[in-house]
Each structure stands twice: as structure tokens, then as C-alpha cells.
Amino acid sequence: MEPWAGCCIFLRGFSFLLVLMTEGAKGGPFKESLGVCSKQTLLVPLRYNESYSQPVYRPYLTLCAGRRICSTYRTTYRVAWREVRREVQQTHVVCCQGWKKPHPGALTCEAICSKPCLNGGVCAGPDQCECASGWAGKHCHVDVDECRTSLTLCSHGCLNTLGSFTCSCPNPLVLGPDGRACAGGPPESSTSAGILSVAVREADSEEHALRREVAELRGRLERLEQWATQAGAWVRAVLPVAPEDLRPEQVAELWGRGDRIESLSDQVLLLEERLGACSCEDNSLGPGLHG
């Protein structure tokens, strides 16, 4: 058989002769699922063309024994078409009033609600909403105040929220794992005093380092002030020569030394401020702790 000789179906057209077989005719309307009033099976006769492999016998001549010419045949295949007629079953459901099919070929029905069900509600029946927890009303638009129900939801305080509620506890109690019952707060850490003691020692070490840095800068400042005094004497020795008679390198050197003196003075003031901030009074670290 050739590779192209497989079967394929080509629909040319079909006519419908519907034979209704309504289920539940004896015992009332058939209900397969919610909202389905009847179910019908339709016998639909179909007529279409179908391709198939048709054998073809072709004669040919061949050489037989005794050098005789014989006539025989071989089989080949070709694609041919034939008309097929058969009946197929189709199922059709009829929805009850207030229900509809999700799509035309569906075998189930869903309820129709004229207004949508809000806040996670679902349409469970004709114009009937099934609301999610925490909501009520015809269209699930009313928030339920759980805190005013007869049920004890929280061991202490209860606060209503949209669609739910939250519990609260008075100090020093805290909410437990279930979010409703209150339990004792976490015990005060026994290492708090030790942590503060370490902080005090670190602050003392930083203060000593700052004091050393201030002393070093003060020494440098004193040396620069001595040089400034000498420079002033030198300037006075140069004067009463007019300032415009000073050489440019002399003016530049004077300005540079003055800038360094001003910069060091600013650093000393900044360190003194930091040193003052590090100084702690006896009760600044809490009761019972001293620097």
C-alpha cells in the first residue's frame, strides 16, 4: 500500500433529521445537575464523502519458462471517494427558568443573578448569592460585625474590619499564635545590663582616643601660633614698606600659613564638640549604671 493510501474524511455537507429521545419521560423531567430540567438525545443522520484506497489490477507481459511470453497482472492502489451515511448521537440539555448554559454546547446550567454577587460571593441560585465569610446581604454587600455576635472570638479586645476582625491585648500581654488569645509578653532580657556595660566601655575607649587626638592637634596649633608670631614680627620688620612692595612668594607663604592655622582651629573645635557629646553624666545610661 502506498503512503498516501491512508483513510481521511472530508465533510461535504450534511442534513439533519432530528429524532428526539427525551429522557425522564416516564418519571418527570430529568435533572442531571443543578438547574437542568431535561436532557435530550438527538440522532443526527450524516452524509459525507470519504476517501479510501481502491485496488487496481493492471495486466502486463512477462517471460515464462521455456522462453514463452506469459500474461499476468499486478495490484496497485489509487485514492477513490465514496459516499458514507451514518447516524450520530448528540446530547442536548434544557435549563430551568432562572438558569442558563455557560456556552451553547454545554451540558450543565448556571444560575442567573440580575445583580452581581460582591466581595467574593457566588451566584448559587436564581438571584441568590452565596456570600463569603464575613459578608451578608442579598448581594453580599453588608459587612458582618463579628465582634457583636454571641460567639467569643477574642479573649480581650475585638476590632471589626471589612469582611473580618482583629483581636487586641492590653499591655503587657501579646496575641498568641492563633491571633485570638492573649499571652504574657516576652520576658525582659537578662543580658540588657551586660550590653549596656559593653557600650559604656566602648564609649570610654572612644573618648580616650578623641582626647589624644585633641591634644595632638593642640600641640600643632601652638607650634603654628608660635610661627605666626614670628611671621608677624617679620612682617612688622618689613613694614613700613608698602604692602604692594612685598614679593609675591612672600604674600603666598603668608596666606598659606594663615589658611593652615584656620583649618587646624576648626578641627580642634569639632573634636571638642564630639568630646563633649561623649561625656556622660552618672545617670545618663540608665538607673544603676555609671560611666
From Swiss-Prot:
The disulfides recorded in the entry are: 37-96, 64-70, 95-109, 113-123, 117-129, 131-140, 147-158, 154-167, 169-182
One annotated GO molecular function: signaling receptor binding
Q: Which residues form a coiled coil?
A: 198-231
Protein localization: Secreted
Q: Which residues form the signal peptide?
A: 1-27
Glycosylation site residues: 49
Read off the SUPFAM superfamilies from this record.
EGF/Laminin (SSF57196), Growth factor receptor domain (SSF57184)
List the GO terms this entry assigns under cellular component, sorted alphabetically.
cell surface; extracellular region
InterPro entries assigned = Dev_Signal_Modulators, EGF-like_Ca-bd_dom, EGF-like_dom, EGF-type_Asp/Asn_hydroxyl_site, EGF_Ca-bd_CS, EMI_domain, Growth_fac_rcpt_cys_sf, NOTCH1_EGF-like
Main location (coarse class): secreted
Give one Pfam family, short name only.
EMI
| Keywords assigned | Calcium, Coiled coil, Disulfide bond, EGF-like domain, Glycoprotein, Repeat, Secreted, Signal
- The record places domain EMI at 33-111
Q: Name one GO biological process term.
A: vasculogenesis
For this protein, the record's PROSITE patterns field holds: ASX_HYDROXYL (PS00010), EGF_1 (PS00022), EGF_2 (PS01186), EGF_3 (PS50026), EGF_CA (PS01187), EMI (PS51041)
Q: Indicate the segments forming the EGF-like domain, all copies.
A: 110-141, 143-183
- Entry keyword Zinc: no
PANTHER family under this entry?
EGF-LIKE-DOMAIN, MULTIPLE 7, 8 (PTHR14949), EPIDERMAL GROWTH FACTOR-LIKE PROTEIN 8 (PTHR14949:SF27)
- Protein name per its UniProtKB record: Epidermal growth factor-like protein 8
What taxonomic lineage is listed for the species of origin? Eukaryota, Metazoa, Chordata, Craniata, Vertebrata
The encoding gene is Egfl8
